């Protein structure tokens, strides 16, 4: 496993998002556990997606998979408008877009017209309906890659009242980092199956990351909103290999005022 995200379900169990690797030996999956960490079940992506991933020669972004997971109760526009509030769904942030060269898979990837095959302009927010054991997805349009970066992707998704917050970021650190964003979008953005640039409300994390005049990490990684409405962000320290090992834990205040 490579746990990258965690959320609490209404029944008190935990769901973890585990990121897969490019080879497919470690698949992207959701893992449900009890409060003691005992695994209750594991869920992988649909077989046709896994088959396309296993046969494609375009593997550059396939190692950037499940990064965050959150729970949302129904109804959800465009996904489950019929669902009642007792029905819950898991929404999973896929870090970067995947492109398939496999015959027959073109319309299953994130760049079906091969506009930017090496680094698709869109990624996905997967939606898993546990009761039906069905997957759906919503496309998420990523910002343009800055000149000094290799890619832009997502690294978290968190449920808030009436919408969601994701982290969208580039892969550069220090003075080279340009996109370190919290992005809020409302439930209505899901209705047409794509979160567009116009539907994003952005909070720039760079001033907060730079407030101590230290090195700016490339990886804001986790977001949580407390019952009192306080929003927290944590960075990934990436251990100490080619990195200082620092972790930043940011308290950004009330969520309600961040995107005004």
Segments (PLM) and residue ranges:
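Sequence/structural signature of beta-propeller domains
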Residues: 1-260
């Amino acid at each position: 496993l490579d746990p990258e995200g965690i959320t609490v379900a209404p029944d008190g169990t935990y769901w973890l998002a585990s990121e897969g690797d490019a080879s497919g030996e470690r698949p992207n999956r959701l893992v449900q556990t009890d409060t003691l960490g005992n695994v209750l079940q594991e869920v992988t992506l649909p077989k046709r997606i896994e088959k396309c991933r296993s046969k494609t020669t375009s593997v550059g972004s396939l190692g950037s998979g499940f990064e965050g997971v959150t729970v949302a109760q129904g109804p959800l526009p465009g996904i489950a408008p019929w669902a009642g509030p007792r029905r819950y769904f898991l929404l999973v942030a896929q870090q970067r877009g995947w492109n398939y060269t496999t015959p027959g898979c073109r319309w299953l990837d994130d760049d079906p017209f091969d506009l930017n095959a090496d680094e698709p302009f869109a990624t996905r927010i997967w939606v898993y309906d546990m009761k039906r054991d069905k997957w759906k997805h919503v496309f998420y349009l990523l910002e343009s890659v800055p000149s000094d970066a290799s890619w832009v992707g997502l690294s978290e998704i968190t449920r808030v009242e009436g919408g969601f917050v994701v982290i969208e970021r580039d892969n550069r650190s220090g003075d080279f980092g340009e996109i370190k964003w919290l992005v809020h979008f409302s439930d209505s953005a899901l209705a047409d199956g794509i979160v567009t640039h116009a539907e994003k409300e952005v909070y720039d994390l760079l001033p907060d990351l730079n407030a101590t005049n230290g090195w700016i990490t490339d990886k804001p990684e986790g977001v949580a909103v407390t019952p009192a409405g306080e929003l927290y962000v944590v960075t990934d320290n990436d251990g100490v290999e080619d990195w200082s090992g620092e972790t930043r834990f940011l308290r950004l205040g009330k969520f309600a005022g961040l995107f005004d």
